[in-house]
Regions:
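Periplasmic-binding protein-like
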Residues: 55, 133-140, 206-251, 269-285
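A ligand-binding cleft/hinge motif common to bilobed small-molecule-binding domains
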Residues: 98-101, 114-123, 171-174, 195-229, ...
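Flexible hinge/capping segments at coil-to-helix
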Residues: 141-159
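Extracytoplasmic small-molecule ligand-binding "clamshell" domains
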Residues: 29-114, 123
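Ligand-binding clefts/hinges and TM-proximal coupling segments of bilobed small-molecule sensing domains
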Residues: 24-39, 167-184, 222, 251-285
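Short helix-initiation/N-cap motifs at beta->coil->alpha
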Residues: 73, 90-102, 147-148, 182-196, ...
Length: 285
């Protein structure tokens, strides 16, 4: 057992460790060979699935300051799919403004955030099957008795707060004109404008409005009929093989009742987390 053999042995172990590290590196899910698992669902062999979330859009996604963990509808659904289809979810915080284009560019394999499926967006990304169909509604301060319909805003001197780059913003502009619409970077900023009186109303997805009201019944309320019907889905890069995989997973969740269970948890007044309760989020440039 001489020095040369010792050096050789050390080199052997070093190379073995490198080889082990390389072999254990997770393969991106859009490159993995998809097989069928024992449960009949696609098996993705432990690959990494990057999921873009804003982490600032209740009830879909947020960071709990108590433990620093990401939580919300997106997290519950995607973590469940990960268990059922053997992949590793990698949640990446991304600003809403530019998220869909980033998916189109291949920066993320999938995006959540309650994305409305539209013909315009479908030109640059592929969508999953819709997991819920919702109404867009008006949200006003709880003590506001001046607004009960879109006509009240159209005929009055009011401002409407929305989030940039959303179908809520597009609908507000089409109904009220751009001069009456103030656009904010995040949804909670728009709601804060309503509560403070800087805006008279906001147009929101009904499920987001119901979730927000769970902890803020004394501050805001939904008024009027639905203004527009929107199906929501996950966004993928155009041509992604993972669309079919996620669609199978969503169908499984619909069949076994898990999707309804998660919807009931987050898309109702029973969801009591407010924007005051969640951690602030910063995004990489």
């Amino acid at each position: 057992y001489n020095l040369k053999s010792k050096k050789t042995l050390i080199l052997f172990f070093a190379l073995a460790m490198v080889a082990s590290a390389c072999s254990s590196a997770a393969v991106p899910c859009d490159e993995v060979e998809i097989t069928t698992g024992e449960n009949g669902l696609p098996d993705l062999d432990g690959c990494e699935f990057t999921f873009a979330v804003e982490n600032a859009y209740l009830p879909f996604n947020y960071i709990d300051p108590a433990d620093g963990e990401g939580k919300g509808w997106d997290y519950d659904v995607f973590n469940y799919l990960a268990e059922e289809m053997n992949f590793t979810p990698v949640f990446v915080a991304a600003a809403w403004d530019g998220m869909i284009q980033a998916v189109a560019d291949g920066q993320y394999m999938i995006a959540g955030d309650g994305i409305s499926i539209t013909d315009e967006r479908d030109k640059i990304v592929d969508f999953s099957d819709s997991y819920i169909v919702l109404q867009q509604r008006m949200l006003v301060a709880a003590d506001n008795d001046s607004i009960s319909s879109a006509a009240d805003i159209q005929n009055g001197d009011f401002k409407v707060a929305t989030q940039k780059g959303t179908t809520n913003y597009d609908l507000a502009v089409s109904l009220f004109g751009a001069d009456k619409v103030d656009a904010y970077d995040q949804f909670d900023f728009a709601i804060a404008a309503v509560i403070s009186g800087d805006a008279a109303a906001s147009i929101v997805d009904e499920v987001a409005g119901l979730g927000y009201m769970g902890a803020n019944k004394d501050k805001v309320k939904l008024v009027g009929e639905g203004l527009q019907t929107d199906p929501l889905g996950f966004a993928f890069p155009d041509g992604s093989p993972l669309v079919a995989v996620v669609n199978e997973g969503l169908a499984h969740m619909k069949d076994n009742g898990k999707l309804q269970e998660i919807n009931d948890k987050f898309f109702s007044p029973g969801f009591t987390v407010s924007y005051d309760d969640i951690a602030e989020v910063t995004y990489d440039e």
